Swiss-Prot record:
Catalytic function, reaction form: L-glutamine + H2O = L-glutamate + NH4(+)
Pfam families in the record: Glutaminase (PF04960)
E.C. number: 3.5.1.2
Name assigned to this protein: Glutaminase
Gene3D superfamilies: DD-peptidase/beta-lactamase superfamily
SUPFAM superfamilies: beta-lactamase/transpeptidase-like
Annotated source species: Pseudomonas entomophila (strain L48)
Known partners and oligomeric status: Homotetramer.
Keywords: Hydrolase
GO function terms (MF aspect): glutaminase activity
Gene designation per UniProt: glsA
Lineage start: Bacteria, Pseudomonadati, Pseudomonadota, Gammaproteobacteria, Pseudomonadales
Amino acid sequence: MQALLQEILDHVHPLLAQGQVAQYIPALAQVDPNQLGIAVQSLDGQLHCAGDAHTPFSIQSISKVFSLVQAINHSGEDIWSRLGYEPSGQAFNSLVQLEVEKGRPRNPFINAGALVICDINQSRYATPTLSMRDFVRRLSANPRIVSDAVVAESEYEHRARNAAMAYLMQAFGNFHNDVDAVLRSYFHHCALSMSCVDVARGFAFLANGGLCPHSGEQVLSRRQAQQVNAIMATSGLYDEAGNFAYRVGLPGKSGVGGGIVAVVPGRYSICVWSPALNASGNSLAGLRALELLSERMTGSVFSAIS
């Protein structure tokens, strides 16, 4: 496994020069694009990694999965009265669709949907930022995970479009808490700093029917884990989810920090990171690495069982 992972990283390394780090978040624009790491966590506890797998990075939209799981934990099916689970077919920060559909976001992985989920969690937790941090620490078995205050503040200073979404949803009666407070929580979630190892371990419960393999905690029911994986498969990579399903064939979630996490139900959770992005905001080398790994080792969830 170790040799295979290193071989894949060597193969995709030339792609680092073809992507570009996220420019619209100033703190992320300073990240060295020549970094590349991968970690594979098996359900029997084995961890395999290569490259910069232990280097922390800003998980950004990967945090939307953790937020969704928190909301499902305390509110269950009730959350779907406020948002859907359909692909949007629009940019992740589109206002047009939100206006047409009267403030009800298509799914929890576009920005408007993630803000609704944060609004739901804001009503539940006295300190949402700390609750999220502690939740992620528990899932990843790493008590040192923190949110990068510099990144969070950088995002807050460029909050206009996200604030516009929140106020638009508030106008339609679908946003209940103080907009500024929810935005603060949202940006601190996005600014969580985790390594490939942390993320792969933190998502292992979704490969294991909702059961965290290292702690024995039933994070979600088996059915709920299936549902989260389904939304990741249809909506997890911005407007490139179809491409990811076609090329990789696994439930996944990406972030503009360059991370992509993927789940192989019953087998593995995987995280790859390279901050050089393609035009859709997904890691260029990361996508190709996961495609090669799917071909060589994991297989697609759409494959026939042999």
